[in-house]
Design a protein with these regions (language model features):
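N-terminal secretory signal peptides that target proteins for export/translocation
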Residues: 1-10
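Sec-dependent signal peptide recognition
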Residues: 13-18
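C-terminal motif of bacterial Sec signal peptides marking the signal peptidase cleavage site
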Residues: 25-27
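N-terminal mature-domain "stem" immediately C-terminal to a signal peptide or N-terminal signal-anchor/transmembrane
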Residues: 29-99
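Extracytoplasmic/secreted envelope proteins and their assembly/folding machinery
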Residues: 43-46, 131-134, 231-235, 266, ...
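Acidic/His-rich structured neighborhood in mature extracellular/periplasmic domains
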Residues: 97-255, 326, 330-333
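Small-residue-rich helix-loop
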Residues: 248-269
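C-terminal soluble interaction/assembly domains
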Residues: 277-333
């Protein structure tokens, strides 16, 4: 956005306050469509590596793992080293750990593997949502390579990973926010997004994060907010049927809290003069995930800085209808 180019502390303060004031007056709810509906559809390839990996038999682990390497030569090394953390050349240790991964009940691996296969037996809805999202993204950025999606079971090690033209999803991390074995591996606030319905949002969010770099000379909170806000705004255009709270990873109650107290949130940010701070502790509090946003109040959800940034960008776009998505994403904050 032209207003947010680096033009000095005093000027950016005045402009920043002005834009935030516009946000407070105008609210949110951009329904303007920036991507036409009648575009050529594409289909993203989804590889069911999970079915193959769980087809390994405890009494023939060595042979079955070799077959996985033969059948999935591009992904198997990524899975073994990147997800399981086992050197590919250490086949004896890999076989030992893999047998435990298949049969262990104390850590819940065996139960979780079965639950994952049952819950993700049908992925038609996921396929449809991802097809729509990547179709719309491909219309905007036709030169971007559409990734191949691999589903796998990670032993609670990974939710979404990205490597070159591969996106991987650990489906065992999306078994529902009340899945009992999550109590052993994550904090309560993280469970909100550990649902099957969150997979498509997480995949597209990861893809955007890797393909749209953050560039800022000063790395102030306001610039971080705007950058995250632009990503969320673009995501809302890729998945227009998704509720706003799902896009940011909030519950409906958390979203409603933010809307109810948005003026108080803004007043708190202004009182603390946080907009132009660069301290990592301040940026982390507002931007990174957590049980709450400590710089505001313990009653708040985490990542309030992302929510505020989205509101700012949404307000900007509703008041500047001639600005295209390309122009928005290419602006320096």
């Amino acid at each position: 956005m032209e207003q947010f180019k680096q033009i000095g502390n005093k000027a950016i303060r005045q402009i920043g306050y002005g834009l935030l004031a516009i946000w407070m007056l105008c609210g949110c709810g951009n329904k303007y469509q920036y991507i036409p509906k009648d575009i050529e559809p594409i289909s993203i390839d989804i590889v069911r590596f999970d079915n193959a990996q769980l087809g390994v038999r405890p009494d023939s682990v060595k042979q079955d793992i070799k077959k996985l390497y033969d059948d999935y030569e591009s992904f198997m090394p990524i899975f073994v080293e990147g997800i399981l953390g086992i050197p590919t050349e250490d086949t004896a240790y890999l076989c030992e750990m893999y047998a435990q991964f298949l049969t262990d009940t104390a850590m819940g691996f065996a139960q979780t593997n079965a639950k994952a296969q049952s819950l993700f037996a049908n992925i038609d809805s996921l396929q449809e949502t991802l097809n729509m999202g990547f179709t719309r993204l491909h219309h905007l950025y036709p030169d971007w390579k559409i990734p191949t999606l691999y589903l796998f079971v990670s032993g609670f090690n990974s939710s979404v990973m990205y490597y070159e033209d591969i996106v991987g999803v650990g489906i065992d991390m999306y078994l529902g926010s009340k899945y009992p074995y999550y109590n052993q591996v994550v904090y309560d606030y993280q469970k909100q997004t550990m649902r099957k319905a969150c997979v498509a949002v997480d995949v597209l969010s990861m893809y955007l994060a890797y393909n749209i770099p953050y560039n800022s000379k000063y790395n102030r909170l306001l610039e971080q907010m705007i950058f995250r806000g632009k990503q969320l705004f673009l995501l809302s255009q890729l998945l227009p049927d998704e509720p706003e709270w799902e896009l940011i990873g909030y519950s409906k109650e958390q979203w409603d809290w933010c809307e109810k107290y948005e003026k108080a949130i803004w007043n708190r940010i202004m009182e603390k003069r946080d907009l132009f701070k660069t301290e990592s502790s301040v940026l982390s509090s507002y931007i990174n995930d957590g049980p709450f946003t400590s710089e505001v109040t313990q009653d708040s959800p985490g990542r309030l800085g992302q929510w505020v940034g989205w509101r700012i960008v949404d307000s900007y776009m509703r008041n500047n209808k001639k600005v295209t998505l390309h122009e928005l994403m290419n602006e320096n904050d």
